[in-house]
Amino acid sequence: MSKDLKILCKDPALELSCYRDHQFSGRKFQQEKLLKESSTLNMGNLSFYTTEEKIHELFSRSDIRNIFMGLDKIKKTACGFCFVECHNRADAENAMRFLTGTCLDEWIICTDWDVGFREGQQYGRGKSGGQVRDEFREDFHSGRGGFGRQTQI
């Protein structure tokens, strides 16, 4: 396939985002290589009320291996993200292609590649136990726990 044709056939939904996990212990090029081969998705912008069952329902046309719901590290309640392990890269690519921008529980979800789930990764990294981005939110969102934690202090 020519270089020009490859550019035309590129699917922007499958490209790597600029986000990199800062807790990854290897080098940047190693992380990018793993991301390009990964069959694990990180789903974000989920409602705090989204359940594992709803994620299974969303992936009903795919055969998935595991779902790891993101948890507030203090309260052990959902905090708006999850990891979905697919059996192969093709299933993960289809999910990425068709689920990015889908509305679930009145929230538009976003998907990104992840190098693979590691124990402890399911916990939010914010000071209050949830996601960092929710701590600085200044507006009220009932689906994401109300006001941001830092704005309440």
Swiss-Prot record:
This is Nuclear cap-binding protein subunit 2-like. One of its GO terms (molecular function) is RNA cap binding. GO terms for cellular component: nuclear cap binding complex. GO terms for biological process: mRNA cis splicing, via spliceosome; mRNA splicing, via spliceosome. Residues 39-116 form the RRM domain. SMART domains: RRM. InterPro entries: NCBP2 (IPR027157), NCBP2_RRM (IPR034148), Nucleotide-bd_a/b_plait_sf (IPR012677), RBD_domain_sf (IPR035979), RRM_dom (IPR000504). CDD domains: RRM_NCBP2. Belongs to the RRM NCBP2 family.
